[in-house]
Amino acid sequence: MSKVTVDRIIIGAGLYGLYSALFCAKQGESVAIIECDPKPFMRATYINQARVHMGYHYPRSLSTAIKSAGYYERFHDDYGFCIHDTFDQIYATSKQFSWTNANEFKKFCDAAGILCEQTDAGIYFNAGYCDGAFRTREDTYDAMLLKEHFLREIGHCNNVWMNCNARIETITKKEDCYEIRLANGDIYISDFVLNATYASTNQILSLISDEMTGNTYRPQLFPIKYELCEIILCETSNELKNVGITVMDGPFFSIMPFGKTGLHSLTSVTFTPHDTSYDEKPLFKCQERSEGYCESDRLGNCNECPAKPESAWQYMSSLARKYLKEEFGFKYKESLFSMKPILKTTEVDDSRPTVIKTYSDTPTFVSVLSGKINTVYDLDDILIKR
């Protein structure tokens, strides 16, 4: 058992956590990273479409599109080594059941100031399925290369401690600091805590108690729903190898390069989410079959869970093949599962804001919730040493 006092505690070792830790370390601050998994980047930073968002995904939320595009170049400059950009990224609008048609999508892109060049939908899609297709500029990142970079940079710092396989038991707010006690008895103390745990954000907040007011203290949780999601990795034909395709704006699909792995990710608005929970903390029937691995108060890693669902490959692949011309072939390689939190307030316009919430100033406790990789820079303002 040890007791360590540091300048900053970062909970969560995904991109937002490691970025924050390195940012603070470069300011000369001592940092402790607390991660529940055996290694960093085992959940949503790795298990997602790996899309470096330029904003095309949000035709009903111009503000989200502009924010994504604003950080796109900076992410490219900082992490170009992990970015795959030598493929054609094609967006198309479905002729039926789409919230947005081709003309509206083009106007949206023009308003957001992002590249959108019309191309022949007949090159990629079966006749009658899409009313427009566009060549865009949007890339994909390789999470494992990004992880290696952060671990290498953090490894050069003598003021950062990473604690993996760490289970937090209590978080106590004291007069001038927060005290975090782990299941193994270790205690970490700091006057600044960042909760960067994404789908576990509310679970971490629920662990906080206030020594001054007693256990009646309860921070306001994020109003989110939870989706248990599947990303399918595919091997592709030569015709599809250097192409990414996203069909908008409704119950459709995307198939695009998965970083620099040589595989494509296949997702579907309808079939990627296997189950949804509207509770404050993730409550799913599969938790009853997880043999204690996952609970509403302790979210397990869906990709490692013994109760993870069967693949929706049959449904996702059928949907994509209905739209795509036969030469753009693909076959199943493996499935990846993760939990995705979505703000309930964004369900109407499908916006994806980055929410940074400060629960206390002195000592400081901050939570961040964001579903986009390149908006990590929103954290800079709260991380800068005052």
Regions found by a protein language model. Give the residues of each.
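Helical element adjacent to the flavin cofactor pocket in flavoenzyme catalytic cores
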Residues: F134-L205, V376-I384
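N-terminal Rossmann-like FAD-binding beta1-loop-alpha1 element of flavoenzymes
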Residues: V6-A32
